[in-house]
Amino acid sequence: MVGMAVTMEHAGMTHLLADGIARLAGPAFPLAAPFIGALGAFMTGSNTNSNVIFGDLQQSVAALVGVSPLIILAGQTAGGAIGSAFAPAKIIVGCSTVEAEEGPALRAVMRYGLAMLAVLALTTGAAIYLFGR
């Protein structure tokens, strides 16, 4: 993961993606930051890997949009923690331990995870607009 993230940064891919996200999301970007963190953790099964892959991206978008990178990166990390909880790798391990089916377990956990992400997105947005310009 680190190799991929470093390659993306050195090749300019991270900045290109950040520019596109900043143009697309604009001032609403803080609401999306936790979802990006959750996506990274969902894909990799790890909050740390999510931060490695998307940390530079989030920081670049924050700079382009003109908001506090500290709050955005806090949203990234908190979103990654939530996303890690319903990562398929973790669901498979848990279900194999208790001999349950993965599909129903993933659907049940996703409902709660998406609700928590929505609250986190609103919290991140509020923190930016109240404290973090």
Where are these regions (language model features)?
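Hydrophobic alpha-helical transmembrane segments of multi-pass integral membrane proteins
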Residues: 1-8, 24-57
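Transmembrane helix-loop junctions in multi-pass membrane proteins
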Residues: 5-18, 43-46, 124-133
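Juxtamembrane and boundary regions of transmembrane helices in multi-pass small-molecule transporters
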Residues: 78-133
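Re-entrant/interfacial helical elements at transmembrane boundaries that shape
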Residues: 48-61, 90-101
